[in-house]
Amino acid sequence: MSQDTLFDKVWDLHKVSSLPGGSDQIFIGLHLIHEVTSPQAFGALKDKNLKVKFPERTVATVDHIVPTDNQSRPFKDNLAEQMIETLEKNCLDHNIRFFNIGSGNQGIVHVVAPELGLTQPGMTIACGDSHTSTHGAFGSIAFGIGTSQVRDVLASQTIAMNKLKVRQIWCDNKLSKGVYAKDLVLHIINELGVKAGVGFAYEFAGPAIDDLSMEERMTICNMSIEGGARCGYINPDEKTFSYIKNKLCAPKNEHWDKALKWWKSLKSDENSIYDDVVKLNASEVEPTVTWGITPGQSISINQQIPLLDDLSPNDKLVAKEAYEYMSFKPGQLIKDTPVDVCFIGSCTNGRISDLRVAAQVLKDKKVSKNVKAFVVPGSEKVATEAKQEGIDQIFKDSGFQWREPGCSMCLAMNSDKLIGNQVSASSSNRNFKGRQGSPSGRTLLMSPAMVAAAAINGKVSDVREFIN
């Protein structure tokens, strides 16, 4: 009787050969590219007079460096314009599908691929971006890769990798009202640590995971990398299949029937052997906020920032650095911390369901006069849906700026940046020093609903106080 995990099954199906040194050559079913990590890779192909091996398995969009305030071409930022022109040319030269600005399908690569039905169970997916793990929400095995591996996939459709161990993270019960997938994944990272996943793939399972929507599952898998894991995934189910059905690039007619039959066979065996199993009680998770300079430094909304004596020797060093950088004191409550900027967006929380939840909090309320708040839809499709539902108007009426799709302030590789020592309440995925554009800017990670609550009060707040 088979005892394989989904990871084992997908890995074995895509294994081309075993390589000297213990790594495997893995075929990549879908390669996603964008404007930042692809130019050098295409340049390397040109130097060797090579063409893209499987252009039909390669899909491009622009997201990282595009401005969100004004997307009229040419961009004011000459570098941004140059990078997008380069991607346009490379896609044209190699016959690669390119979802450009104005296509109706441009956006953050990890938002666009699922909403188009490109992301499917049983796939291997690679992209020159660490948050490629997002796609594991569909039962695919998805890896972020560096530019040299982007080159390899373009040239051969394969990468060399060591097979990962698999840790199952079992989440019992269900999340309480006012607690979201973002809170759960921040809680998981805090419990296990930011390095616990090194060498692992994370399988998220249990009643709490089953209860999540597909977009919430994407949030969970998106931040696997923040826990040190190379990828994260969830076994596909009826929610997965329903989400994909009738999407632009999903299989149709008899191809759908054939795909569905195969997808339903793709799940970890009941008696799968895992390298490690961790069990958590999701009903105990509360709205969660980061206080430090790693995503693992988080606490519940009513908790105090940890005392040094309560931390392990390794955690103490990072905590001291975080106290100083964030201007927090041990024992201080995170609640009521003043914020200057509120950002809703990113590949973690820039989908339509994220905007809906935040809009419910903001409806008939106003952003604090001391706060600059802006929302960046994850894609043109998300923006269109939001406008059709009147969500954009709720944001505008509250005082949020409504922006165009892009990565925006998640990584500030564009014009959206913190200034000086500003404190940001952000729905993104990383709170490293300088992550949001200012060398001294400070980031507090939280759910979109919590960002909305912070925007209204001008300080870190418990969103449950806004929910009837």
UniProtKB/Swiss-Prot annotation:
Q: Where is the composition biased (Polar residues)?
A: 424-441
Q: Which cysteines are joined by disulfide bonds?
A: none
Subunit structure of this entry?
A: Heterodimer of LeuC and LeuD.
Where does this protein come from, organism-wise? Answer: Prochlorococcus marinus (strain MIT 9215)
Output this protein's name: 3-isopropylmalate dehydratase large subunit
| Gene from which this protein is expressed | leuC
Specify the domain of life of the species encoding this protein. Bacteria
Its Enzyme Commission number(s) read: 4.2.1.33
UniProt xrefs under PROSITE patterns: ACONITASE_1, ACONITASE_2
